[in-house]
C-alpha cells in the first residue's frame, strides 16, 4: 500500500463518516473524544463555496483538536470544484480535501453530483484531476458507492480512475445508489476494490460492532474503516472498536449516566451555538431519536423526545429515566451494563478520557 497520509502508517484508522445534518463540529468533537482518528465535515456544495455563500462557510468551522480533518466537497463542474477547494484551503487549512462521489440524495444527483458521477466517469475524472492539481501538495481523497445500480457495479474501475487522477485514499460504501440505505452492504466488492488499487481503501457500510470491523479487516485488504450510522446512536463505538482491536475483548457500553451526559452535553452546546434554545432543541429531535436506540425503554423515550423544546426538559427526562420506575420509564436492568474494570483498561489502552 502506498500512501501520503500519515495516519495510515502502521495503523488502522477509524474514520467518522461525513453525514449531512449529523457530523457538525459538536458531534465530531464528541466522536473524537471517544477515539475517532479521522474526521470529515458534512458535505459542502462547491457552488456555495465558489459563490462565497456565508451559510456554506459555517459548515467549514472546526477546531484544531479535531485534526486530522478533511472538508468534503460535492459538485460536477471541474473548474468550480477546483476553485472551491482552493478557497477552502485558504479559509480553514484542512488536512485534506475529500470528494463526494457517493451521495444518493435526489437533489444532489439531479445536478450530476454525488453518486451520479459514477455513471459519468469522464466528468468524475475531470473533477478529481482538477481538484488534485488545484490544492497540491495537500492530499485529496474521495468517497464512492459500488455503482449506480445492481446492473452497473463499477467500483473497481472507478477506483482505478481515481487512483490515476492522484487521489490519495478512497472510502467505499458497499451499496449502490439505487439501494440508498436498504439491503446489505456488499463487502465482496469493497474487498475487490482494496485488491485492485495500491492506495488505502476505507471500508464503509453495516459496521455496527467491533466484531464486525475485525471480521471485515480480516476478510479484506482494507486499510481502515468509516463508521456512520452506528456512531449516531453510540459515539463510543470508536472506543469499543479500538479496545477490541488491541485486546480481543469486548468493551461494554458506557454506564447509563455517561450516555446521558453525552446527550445533555450535545444539547447544551447545540443550544449555545444556535442562540435560540427552542429552535435548537427542536432541531435536535431527530438526533435524540438516534441516541435513544442505545438506551433502555427506547420507545417511551422517543415519545418524550418528540415534544421537547428546552435543555431543561431533556435534563428532566434524563433524571427520571435514571431514577427508576417513574412515569413509565423504568430502565430494564438486564440491558444495563454494570461497572466494569475493562472501561478503566480501555482508557489506558486508548490514552484518552471520555469525560475530557
Language-model features: locations:
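Glycine-rich, positively charged N-terminal anion/phosphate-binding segment
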Residues: 1-10, 19-95
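Alpha/beta catalytic cores of nucleotide-metabolism and tRNA/nucleoside-modifying enzymes
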Residues: 1-15, 20, 25-26, 139, ...
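Active-site beta-loop-alpha junctions enriched in small/polar residues
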Residues: 19-21, 44-46, 74-76, 102-104, ...
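Conserved beta-strand positions in the central sheet of alpha/beta enzyme cores
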Residues: 39-40, 70-72, 98, 141, ...
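Short, solvent-exposed helix-helix connector turns and helix-capping sites enriched
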Residues: 52-53, 120-121, 234, 276
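Alpha/beta enzyme core
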Residues: 82-113, 117, 121-199
Amino acid at each position: 500500500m502506498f500512501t501520503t497520509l500519515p495516519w495510515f502508517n502502521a495503523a488502522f484508522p477509524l474514520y467518522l463518516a461525513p453525514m449531512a445534518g449529523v457530523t457538525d463540529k459538536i458531534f465530531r468533537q464528541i466522536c473524537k473524544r471517544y477515539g475517532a482518528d479521522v474526521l470529515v465535515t458534512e458535505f459542502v456544495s462547491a457552488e456555495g463555496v465558489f459563490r462565497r455563500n456565508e451559510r456554506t462557510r459555517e459548515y467549514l468551522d472546526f477546531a484544531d483538536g479535531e485534526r486530522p480533518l478533511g472538508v468534503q466537497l460535492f459538485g460536477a463542474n471541474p473548474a468550480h470544484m477546483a476553485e472551491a477547494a482552493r478557497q477552502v484551503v485558504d479559509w480553514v487549512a484542512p488536512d485534506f480535501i475529500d470528494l463526494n462521489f457517493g451521495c444518493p440524495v435526489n437533489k444532489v444527483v439531479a445536478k450530476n453530483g454525488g453518486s451520479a458521477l459514477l455513471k459519468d466517469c469522464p466528468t468524475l475524472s475531470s473533477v478529481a484531476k482538477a481538484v488534485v492539481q488545484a490544492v497540491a501538495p495537500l492530499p485529496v481523497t474521495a468517497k464512492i458507492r459500488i455503482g449506480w445500480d445492481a446492473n452497473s457495479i463499477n467500483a473497481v474501475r472507478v477506483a482505478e480512475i481515481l487512483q490515476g487522477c492522484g487521489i490519495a485514499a478512497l472510502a467505499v460504501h458497499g451499496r449502490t445508489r439505487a439501494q440508498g440505505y436498504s439491503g446489505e452492504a456488499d463487502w465482496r466488492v469493497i474487498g475487490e476494490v482494496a485488491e485492485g488499487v495500491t492506495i488505502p481503501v476505507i471500508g464503509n457500510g453495516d459496521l455496527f460492532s467491533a466484531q464486525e470491523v475485525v471480521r471485515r479487516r480480516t476478510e479484506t485488504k482494507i486499510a481502515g474503516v468509516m463508521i456512520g450510522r452506528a456512531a449516531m446512536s453510540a459515539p463510543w463505538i470508536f472506543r469499543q472498536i479500538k479496545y477490541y482491536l488491541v485486546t480481543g475483548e469486548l468493551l461494554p457500553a458506557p454506564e447509563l449516566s455517561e450516555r446521558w451526559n453525552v446527550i445533555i452535553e450535545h444539547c447544551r452546546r447545540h443550544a449555545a451555538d444556535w442562540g435560540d434554545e427552542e429552535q435548537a432543541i427542536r432541531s435536535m429531535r431527530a438526533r435524540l431519536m438516534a441516541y435513544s436506540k442505545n438506551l433502555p425503554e427506547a420507545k417511551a423515550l422517543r415519545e418524550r423526545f418528540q415534544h421537547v423544546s428546552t435543555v431543561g426538559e431533556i435534563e428532566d427526562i434524563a433524571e427520571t429515566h435514571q431514577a427508576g420506575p417513574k412515569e413509565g420509564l423504568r430502565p430494564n436492568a438486564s440491558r444495563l451494563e454494570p461497572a466494569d474494570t475493562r472501561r478503566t483498561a480501555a482508557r489506558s489502552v486508548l490514552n484518552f478520557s471520555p469525560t475530557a
